[in-house]
Amino acid sequence: MQYLILSLIFLIPSLGMLTGLSIAATVAFFLLSIIITGFISFIQKQEFNKKFFIKLYPRFGFDDIFCIINKIKTELLFTAWCFISCLFAVHPINSLVTFTKVFVLLFLRFVSNAVTFQNVLYIKNSLILGIITAILLFFIEYSSHGFLTRMFKTHFGLYMLDRGCALLSITTWVAIIILFSNGHNINSFILYIVVLYLLSISDSLASFLGFSIGGIIFILARLIKTIFFKLITISLITGSLLFPVIAKQIDPQNLSEKYLATQPSAAHRLFIWHFVANKIIIRPILGYGFASSKYIETGDNAMIDYRGEKLHPLPLHPHNNILQITLELGILGLALFLCLVYKYLKEIDNIKVSNFRAASYSCFINYYIIGMISYNIWQTWWILSGIWILVLMKLLVKPDIIIDN
């Protein structure tokens, strides 16, 4: 089973570069493998009989349960509101199905958190090798116009590597932490520059922006660490609260003509955000219900006429996590979501090792920015990408570094 896990750690970033949607299957299988490994180890170490349960019960009573609930009360409140919002969603059954799927994924993450591994060095090497392979695969596809992809598909577009680039951008921060912890500072810098260049020539603008800003965040977190937590928290929460207001006030047609004439995809996002902001005003407090974005009706008169093309004002999701949360869960859901953001930023700030704290901030911001520009917050592969990073942090950090997951 250990060899299987090592293989998956190598395959997830490398295979993910070529087929981004494979992340959903490989990471889910990875989590199940971890849980099974932990269960087998548990059985081997303990005598599985009545005496064991009698011995175990006094050590894990109601006080422990209340302690766990208290630690995750913010998550529970947000989850409860997501569930309640399913009941008044545009399509309640579909929303409940999506909610169940997301809940199961997060539960797998919660269970896998208790598992530890002995061969950490092999896991680190597998991850770094997987990242290097992903980088090589990108350049092969980029220079050969999709030689490998066209073996399985009829055509190739650089956009097909966007999900792989997004995964690479956040996974690289874990590798940077590993290299820093082993004293390979120059190697970590080289890795950052190589990935930054890769993302700059890719079609994934969101990943490039997230990774670039992540680098700036890393430097600031090291230079002004005494006030950095307050600075990043105020900036992130204030910006998130103001974003729906800004999206309402912008003139997407004018901005697109002036600044995004050569970026039709980015221009389309401005129209989407403006449309969503107007929809939020109709139901600002409660929203339209969990995962309801793709079911909100849009009439023919709402279609966007941009340079002779008809664009949909809300194709599947808002392409912005803050707008999606506000649209679906209302101001109440946004407030709970930002409470979670504050909690996770505080947990990162509690990390004592400077490089690890700075890289964790960078990874968090990287993930956050990509979500602010591109993907559906409830997409299976995107949720599992975040879980993948959390599991790697748990498995690969030094024993003296404590993370409250």
UniProtKB/Swiss-Prot annotation:
Subcellular locations according to the entry: Membrane
Keywords assigned by UniProt, alphabetized: Membrane, Transmembrane, Transmembrane helix
Superkingdom assignment: Bacteria
Transmembrane parts of this sequence: 23-43, 77-97, 120-140, 156-178, 201-221, 227-247, 270-290, 322-342, 353-375, 377-397
Pfam family name, one: Wzy_C
Chief place where the protein resides: membrane
Record keyword Transmembrane present: yes
GO cellular component assignments: membrane
Keyword Transmembrane (UniProt): yes
Family affiliation: Belongs to the O-antigen ligase family.
Name of this chain's protein: Putative polysaccharide ligase RP358
